[in-house]
């Protein structure tokens, strides 16, 4: 309530838990311990939703499913299919920021589980490499995601932050600005100004 009373109307959770749940290595690890991923996912969902209870109607809440972002490396891989029916359908947030900058994140099919009215922010621009993405390829991927979510509920962003920790990623300031410029150009071309 302190943040809200100070004027904050948008909070984004950076939730690495869900990213780990997608990882086949993590899934094998917990299975060896006799833990079911579905049970663990449902418990985390319950806890998250409990923490979000009673929020004011004009407070926007979003979740970034983070896969780790330390000095241009990552911590987890795997498509969203193992968590989609739980997280995308039932977490009480307004939007999901999802990493889709490389093959580690799988395809867009799990987006079919996103509850009606929720938005998906497609992280198609990597923050881990200075290489600038091809505009036409990114636009094609947005339209591929549109098979599962209407275009008016899709957005575009970098896959994660440029400096999720003090050391940051292996990009110069100019390379970061060029990526943000690309996001803006693509967004204007796809959704208009």
Predicted features along the sequence, with ranges:
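Domain-level signal for soluble alpha/beta catalytic cores
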Residues: 1-193
């Amino acid at each position: 309530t302190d943040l809200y009373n100070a004027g904050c109307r948008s909070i984004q959770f950076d939730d690495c838990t869900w990213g780990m749940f997608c990882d086949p290595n993590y899934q094998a690890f917990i299975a060896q311990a006799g833990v079911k991923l579905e049970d663990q996912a449902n418990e985390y969902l319950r806890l998250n939703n409990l923490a979000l209870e009673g929020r004011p109607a004009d407070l926007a809440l979003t979740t970034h499913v983070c896969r780790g972002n330390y000095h241009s490396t990552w911590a987890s891989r795997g498509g969203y299919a193992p968590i989609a029916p739980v997280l995308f359908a039932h977490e009480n947030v307004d939007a999901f920021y999802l990493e889709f900058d490389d093959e580690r994140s799988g395809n867009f099919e799990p987006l079919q589980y996103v509850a009606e009215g929720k938005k998906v922010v497609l992280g198609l621009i990597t923050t881990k490499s200075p290489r600038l993405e091809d505009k036409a390829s990114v636009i094609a991927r947005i339209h591929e995601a549109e098979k599962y979510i209407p275009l008016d509920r899709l957005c575009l962003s970098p896959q994660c932050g440029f400096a999720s920790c003090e050391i940051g990623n292996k990009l110069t300031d100019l390379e970061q600005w060029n990526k943000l410029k690309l996001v803006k150009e693509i967004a204007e071309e796809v959704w208009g100004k």
